């Protein structure tokens, strides 16, 4: 829900596909584009991103500027025109500027009455006056109910990201733990996305790290396999996980079907909240084994109990009276907002995460929280209970909308006493601390950017830094990569990798590889600029055109990059910096190169140098990871490359079915023919390739 800036405030919630009218959005309401160093402590010069938090604080518009009467009158006239045609029924409205950018999306029980409040000549706060002054068009869609309007409003806000709405940022899906249900020996794995595979899903967890740690501990406690089905089917002896007691070895019959089924049941019970009963069962078995002098078995049960205790110790608070709930708390400071979310499922704490929604300074905590909730649950199933730190307007309307989405009752409340109040207070403390850390990190990053600009002689601190590197082994599996950093840290959703495509490259020709990467990147960027799109910011307000391009290499790499930009007519528009490693590749002894300037040497403890090293190392980490994936794929498919008529799709099908190249080689013609997409002729060709006849 996004709070309406007029007399009455709106709420919004996520629209399920079956709750809107048959034509919920008219053709004219299809989504549109949104508008778009010396005193630094060296220890603070590193860019860090907590996986549980957003990486960046949003840009906050200055709402103190007065609005001229002329534009305000024009905007009111446009709104008055819309009022004359507006219905008195529920609906959603959108305000657009002269460039056809959506400024604001709102909903109302009575659209005509709501729009009339904007047409008043006086009584608006500066933020609303600025919005009215920029408005030239108002679009309206009627809905059957106010709840339907609320759902549609939240959906449109997430799609269009209007400037004057509260915007949820970095809204990626949460990871779950899945115990599969489509194999006789269920697998435990991390899952993100649509829950289409049969099995039991547990979560959401606040971060991938929390899921990975929990799965590792669950493997130690319950010995449930984590391997893929194809790997499972290809085993002829137990793998390493069996040897280190993190799997029971069902693949090779080390445990029988009833025994493995019991392990899976215990794991499911533990994740379902019956942890005390599971621990009691294991304790009884440990005592029994000890009494029977089976000390090795008793030690195994002891280790499993310790793994369960480790999981629970990581969860921190585990409420006694709350079975399934999400807890939201908001704290505002310095014009920014932080919403901390805790997830409780089956009476267990599955972690927490901090969000920093984009909202103008004049929004109250209640307004930001209400709008945040609607967008948050747009693509997530709501729990039975939602606890809030602040009372929000139209709380009942939001609860009704979430009930429609979930197909069951959803309660939304701001508790005043008891354990629920304590949970909210704990979340509020975390929100306050998270925002404090983020403000401090942002201030440090700002000083680093200023120091970098001073050191390199830039006209202003860079808003977008791109760093390039490439990786290969004697020219094979060559890949280039670009990472992006801004005033608030790394912007990982804008990282890019480039598979080197040029034929005839001399193996190991780093200059040619860098030229190809930069040509592909800046040709695309120059084309976008010619069309007028390159200057427009992305959703997170980061400009698309870099202020500084850093190349991992010395003067030669720098000249190669400069040549590419000159060929494209961009030589004067991009600042280049080459970073050459020191003697013996020692950190702290790097040399910096810029076109037509003497080499720059910084003191080893200079925070600006440390900052540049961190940027270079992040690019190196990213490109090495991309190269390893390519190499792993190449090694895995080695041996299938030479079979005529077997392309990438069939290779993947064969490897998915058999797991390894050795199993493909062992397969009979009949087994090969069972693979989806492999015809009888292809099966014969594959078999003959691995089993050539005499002569």
From Swiss-Prot:
Question: Which keywords accompany this UniProt record?
Answer: Cytoplasm, DNA damage, DNA excision, DNA repair, Excision nuclease, SOS response
| Gene3D superfamilies in the cross-refs | 5' to 3' exonuclease, C-terminal subdomain, GIY-YIG endonuclease, UVR domain, UvrC, RNAse H endonuclease domain
Q: Where in the numbering of this chain does the UVR domain appear?
A: 276-311
Respond yes or no to whether keyword DNA repair is given for this record: yes
The cross-references to InterPro entries, in alphabetical order and at most eight, read: GIY-YIG_endonuc (IPR000305), GIY-YIG_endonuc_sf (IPR035901), GIY-YIG_UvrC_Cho (IPR047296), Hlx-hairpin-Hlx_DNA-bd_motif (IPR003583), RuvA_2-like (IPR010994), UVR_dom (IPR001943), UVR_dom_sf (IPR036876), UvrABC_protein_C (IPR050066)
Q: Biological process GO terms, please?
A: nucleotide-excision repair; SOS response
Compositional bias (Low complexity): 18-27
Question: Care to name a GO molecular-function term for this sequence?
Answer: DNA binding
Report the residue ranges that make up the GIY-YIG domain in this protein: 88-166
Q: Where in the cell is it found?
A: Cytoplasm
Chain segments carrying region Disordered:
1-53
Basic and acidic residues composition bias: residue spans: 1-10
Superkingdom of origin: Bacteria
Q: Name one Pfam family in it.
A: UvrC_RNaseH
Gene Ontology CC entries for this record: cytoplasm; excinuclease repair complex
What family does this chain come from, according to its entry? Belongs to the UvrC family.
What job does this protein perform? The UvrABC repair system catalyzes the recognition and processing of DNA lesions. UvrC both incises the 5' and 3' sides of the lesion. The N-terminal half is responsible for the 3' incision and the C-terminal half is responsible for the 5' incision.
Under the subunit heading, UniProt states: Interacts with UvrB in an incision complex.
Q: Any idea what this protein is called? A: UvrABC system protein C
Q: Which organism is it from?
A: Rhodopseudomonas palustris (strain BisB5)
């Amino acid at each position: 829900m996004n709070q309406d800036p007029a007399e009455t405030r709106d709420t919004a919630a996520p629209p399920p596909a079956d709750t809107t009218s048959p034509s919920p959005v008219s053709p004219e309401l299809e989504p549109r584009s949104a508008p778009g160093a010396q005193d630094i402590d060296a220890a603070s010069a590193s860019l860090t991103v907590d996986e549980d938090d957003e990486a960046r604080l949003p840009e906050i518009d200055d709402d103190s500027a007065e609005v001229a009467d002329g534009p305000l009158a024009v905007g009111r006239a446009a709104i008055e025109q819309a009022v004359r045609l507006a219905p008195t029924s529920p609906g959603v409205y959108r305000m657009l500027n002269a460039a056809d950018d959506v400024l604001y999306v709102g909903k109302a029980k009575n659209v005509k009455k709501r729009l009339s409040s904007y047409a008043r000549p006086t009584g608006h706060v500066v933020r609303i006056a600025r919005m009215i002054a920029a408005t030239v068009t108002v679009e309206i869609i009627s809905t059957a109910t106010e709840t339907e309007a609320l759902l549609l409003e939240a959906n449109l806000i997430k799609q269009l990201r209007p400037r004057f709405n509260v915007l949820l940022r970095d809204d990626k899906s949460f990871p779950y733990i899945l115990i599969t249900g489509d194999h006789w020996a269920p697998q435990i794995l991390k899952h993100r996305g649509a829950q289409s595979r049969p099995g039991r899903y547990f979560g959401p967890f606040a971060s991938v790290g929390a899921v990975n740690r929990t799965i590792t501990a669950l493997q130690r406690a319950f010995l449930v396999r984590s391997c893929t089905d194809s790997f499972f089917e290809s085993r002829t002896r137990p793998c390493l996980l069996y040897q280190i007691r993190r799997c029971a070895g069902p693949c090779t019959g080390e445990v029988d079907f009833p025994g493995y089924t019991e392990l899976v049941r215990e794991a499911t019970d533990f994740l379902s909240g019956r942890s005390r009963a599971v621990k009691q069962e294991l304790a009884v078995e440990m005592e029994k084994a000890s009494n029977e002098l089976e000390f090795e078995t008793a030690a195994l049960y002891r280790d499993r109990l310790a793994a369960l205790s480790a999981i629970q110790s990581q969860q921190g608070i585990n409420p006694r009276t709350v079975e399934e709930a999400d807890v939201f708390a908001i704290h505002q400071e310095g014009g920014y907002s932080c919403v901390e979310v805790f997830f409780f499922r089956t009476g267990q704490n599955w972690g927490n995460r901090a969000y920093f929604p984009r909202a103008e300074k004049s929004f109250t905590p209640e307004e930001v929280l209400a709008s945040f909730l609607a967008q948050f649950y747009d693509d997530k199933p709501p729990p039975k209970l939602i606890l809030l730190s602040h009372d929000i307007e139209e709380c009942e309307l939001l609860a009704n909308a979430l009930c429609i989405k979930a197909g069951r009752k959803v309660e939304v409340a701001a508790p005043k006493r008891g354990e629920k109040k304590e949970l909210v207070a704990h979340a509020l403390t975390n929100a306050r601390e998270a925002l404090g850390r983020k403000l401090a990190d942002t201030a440090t990053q700002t000083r680093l950017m200023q120091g970098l600009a001073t050191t390199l002689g830039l006209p202003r601190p860079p808003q977008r830094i791109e760093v390039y590197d490439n990786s290969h082994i004697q020219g094979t599996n060559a890949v280039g990569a670009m990472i992006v950093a801004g005033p608030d840290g790394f912007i990982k959703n804008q990282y890019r990798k480039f598979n080197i495509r040029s034929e005839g490259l001399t193996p190991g020709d780093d200059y040619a590889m860098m030229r190809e990467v930069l040509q592909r990147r800046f040709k695309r960027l120059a084309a976008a600029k010619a069309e007028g799109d390159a200057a427009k910011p992305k959703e997170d307000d980061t400009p698309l055109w870099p202020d500084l391009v850093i190349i991992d290499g010395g003067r030669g790499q720098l000249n190669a990059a400069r040549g590419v930009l000159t060929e494209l007519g961009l030589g004067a528009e991009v600042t280049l910096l080459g970073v050459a490693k020191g003697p013996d590749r020692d950190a702290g002894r790097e040399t910096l190169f810029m076109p037509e300037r003497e080499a720059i040497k910084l003191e080893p403890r200079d925070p600006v140098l440390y900052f540049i090293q961190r940027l270079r190392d992040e690019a190196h980490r990213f490109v090495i990871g991309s190269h390893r994936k390519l190499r792993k794929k190449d090694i895995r498919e080695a041996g299938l490359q030479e079979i005529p008529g077997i392309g990438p799709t069939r290779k993947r099908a064969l490897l998915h079915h058999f797991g390894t190249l050795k199993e493909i080689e062992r397969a009979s013609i009949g087994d090969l023919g069972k693979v989806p997409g492999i015809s009888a002729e292809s099966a014969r060709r594959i078999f003959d390739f691995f089993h050539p006849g005499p002569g």
